[in-house]
């Protein structure tokens, strides 16, 4: 127990595999769940004072945590999940579930968020990655974000300063952490919005292996190609290392089928990259983030 952080939900030596979508990941020295910005600021101030590393995991959906875990503080925003509407502007805290946020927009007949109706993860992670699907992406509706800088300062970043690109934002370089974000939506028809979300979710269920733990889409889309198609053409569907395999349903996904480890994921990713490059000449670039220490 860290006495200076009394009252904050902090768990010591906590296995992160219980919190990741892949169901892999070693322990965090300290796993913290702040309830508000004040608690978050206290954690960061303490970590900086003690020269302890800290990072925010978000929803840990498009992420692999290595088997040795993470030193210092890991901060999860599960309890920072409020969503507010002000006219056609939706503001969500970083820990708000992305799928649930799209449902709130639908309930109020606001359009613009439909593309994200089946994307797992949090608002903070979606902004960080400029998450997208089916022709839409976060940058299309993003207004601004409040962020926490590595030094512990809170500031606001505009859409222009975020410099969005394909699965990219400026904060991937700066180390700033989203704590809330605002999005510009438009008035729409509830039934039309609902039908579009149902259509997109049906497509996702048909094409993606949602029944298994996974990190979502593993690779970025290479220019002029589709990663899944290249992997399939290299005869890698179903290829397995340890407990992790290339999905038979969608080759762009790697699923944890038998108590796989982060090392299994990393080894399979490396094997797929090498095999696809040898087969097609295209070098795939991972979309998934890999963090932490090896065993």
From Swiss-Prot:
Q: Where is it mostly found?
A: cytoplasm
The prosthetic group or cofactor this protein requires is: FAD
| Gene Ontology BP terms | cell division; cell wall organization; peptidoglycan biosynthetic process; regulation of cell shape
Which E.C. number(s) belong to this protein?
1.3.1.98
Query: Single GO molecular-function term?
Result: UDP-N-acetylmuramate dehydrogenase activity
- Physiological role: Cell wall formation.
Q: What family does the entry list?
A: Belongs to the MurB family.
Protein name per Swiss-Prot or TrEMBL? UDP-N-acetylenolpyruvoylglucosamine reductase
Question: Its catalytic activity?
Answer: UDP-N-acetyl-alpha-D-muramate + NADP(+) = UDP-N-acetyl-3-O-(1-carboxyvinyl)-alpha-D-glucosamine + NADPH + H(+)
Keyword check for Thylakoid: no
Indicate the enzyme's highest-level EC class: oxidoreductase
Kindly tell me the pathway this chain contributes to: Cell wall biogenesis; peptidoglycan biosynthesis
- Sorted alphabetically, which SUPFAM superfamilies does this protein's record hold? FAD-binding/transporter-associated domain-like (SSF56176), Uridine diphospho-N-Acetylenolpyruvylglucosamine reductase, MurB, C-terminal domain (SSF56194)
Q: Where is the FAD-binding PCMH-type domain?
A: 23-188
The record's gene field reads murB
A GO CC term assigned to this protein in UniProt: cytosol
**Keywords tagged on the record:** Cell cycle, Cell division, Cell shape, Cell wall biogenesis/degradation, Cytoplasm, FAD, Flavoprotein, NADP, Oxidoreductase, Peptidoglycan synthesis
Subcellular localization, as worded in the UniProt entry? Cytoplasm
Highest taxon above the source species? Bacteria
What positions constitute the catalytic site?
167, 217, 287
